[in-house]
A protein has these predicted regions:
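Nuclease and nuclease-like effector domains acting on nucleic acids or nucleotide cofactors
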Residues: 2-115, 124-186
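Short active-site segment of divalent metal-dependent hydrolases/proteases
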Residues: 121
């Protein structure tokens, strides 16, 4: 009995320590943490598909990582490999993707047909785990998910090269990634 109590106390202390470490790290969370979708009333199809290939701005308005500012881009987004340090694990994004496919009311419910994409990309300091910055972007259609990746890379290059401010790039991609480059003259 005494050993069981001691193991319970040690396990609880370890779990508490991990939770505190995850909070202290800012972007780390337990891999088993269940994602919380944006608060919406109603059931399935609470998000509109009318703006595809863009997300519903009510469900997915975008969100920023507070560690990334114009002053910190030299030590964050402009450092090669930095996004890998903040990218959420697939266990988190896959669970969120399944929830959001239902919220968007997609008739195709196969998660493989969607990329759980950051509206404001990690390359521009988008919030890594905020459900308001993530959405199930279709991998099919006239402008599939991989089309946006090229825009993200060009915007990051322009921001890191000093041709566009971080705020301008974030605003352009969040409002309409299909016109972001032309709006910024890139």
């Amino acid at each position: 009995m005494m050993i069981r109590q001691r193991l319970t106390v040690v396990a609880a202390a370890t779990a508490l320590g991990l939770a505190v470490a995850g909070l202290a790290g800012g972007t780390a969370q337990a891999a088993t943490a269940k994602p919380k979708p944006p608060a919406k009333s109603g059931a399935a199809a609470s998000c509109s598909r009318a703006r595809l290939p863009l997300p519903d701005p009510t469900c997915t308005p975008g969100a920023y990582n507070p560690a990334v500012t114009q002053a910190t881009i030299g030590s964050t987004i402009c450092v090669s490999g930095w996004t890998a340090t903040v990218r959420p694990p697939a266990s988190y994004t896959n669970a969120l993707k399944t929830q959001q496919i239902a919220q968007y009311g997609f008739s195709d419910t196969n998660p493989a047909d969607y990329e759980e994409d950051h509206l404001v990309p990690l390359e521009l300091g988008g919030a890594p785990r905020d459900p308001h910055n993530l959405w199930p972007e279709p991998r099919y259609g006239s402008q599939p998910a991989q089309s946006k990746d090229q825009v993200e890379n060009k915007l990051k290059t322009a921001v890191c090269g000093g041709r566009v401010s971080l705020a301008a790039a974030r605003g352009a991609i969040a409002s309409d990634w299909t016109t972001a480059l032309s709006r910024l003259g890139l």
